[in-house]
Amino acid sequence: MSEHGMISRELCKPDSAFAELEKAKSAWRKEVLKLGFGGNVPFAHYVNGWAVYQTLACRLMGRCSVYQSGGAIGFRDQLQDAVNLLLISPTPARRQILDCCAHQYLEGDVMHWWHAMPDGDRGVRTRCSDDMLWLVWALCEYVEKTGDTDICSEAVYYVNSSPLEGSETDRYEMPQRSSVSTSVLDHAKAAVDCCANRGVGMHGLLLFGSGDWNDGMNNIDGEGVWLSWFFAHTVRRFADLLVMLCKQGSDHYRALAASCGTAADRAWDGSWYLRGYWSDGEPIGSKNDG
């Protein structure tokens, strides 16, 4: 009988099964009960255990949710999940930042999601406008929370494929690893530059592309307020990181951030901020919409 068969037979015995279950519970308790948020209230139980368990088991390990069970590694998704665990352990965030750098194209855009396959990773190249910025955000969060600046100098290869053509909104592919590697900091610069170089619309806001965090807004073809906010917030922090590392370029990036932030502030509609603008200049999410 194979080793797996012997293990299966042993676990069919109730005593053995219950003993292994308790071992698994004990291991998970050690992993997730690290915050020590005070109080015997439901919120404390959620934060101290279940939120961490869900992030680790469901999001990072299982890569699934109640509405999405494809098992792919999402560029923005797993960066957000891993950064949320920084108070528990910095390891997932560090690992995810490096992995996402390895799924960035030479042009600065990134794979929206991918499946890790034995013969090479397969995924989609898109025109989503926010994906690459999450790498910059995650790097700033990681360095700020851990003080580990060494990650900024780690060298990581890019991936390479033909850029999307004019009529292509996305492409499923297996890109090749390029011969070019740069520091994580330069990967972050490439991400900011890629987003900025796509330009702004008539209101000075960054362009939606094929979705700016809200993937359902893939046919707007206009300008995004949220995206411009996120760019301003993230790039301002990136400029601060450059100063901390004694690197050049902080003034340039601070000016880019200020320009986007100012344009986004002008999107105030009297009661709330607009969501964006269609390509013809019509507002999205106005208080005057029916």
Describe the predicted segments one by one:
Residues 49-63, 103-115, 199-214, 271-283:
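Active-site-adjacent bridging/hinge elements
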Residues 17, 82-93, 97-202, 225-232:
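Aromatic-rich carbohydrate-recognition surfaces in CAZymes
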Residues 5-10, 149-158, 246-253, 271-277:
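Short, glycine/acidic-rich hinge or "gate" loops at secondary-structure transitions
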Residues 1-72, 162-178, 241-243, 248-255, ...:
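Acidic/polar, glycine-enriched structural segments that form the non-catalytic walls/loops
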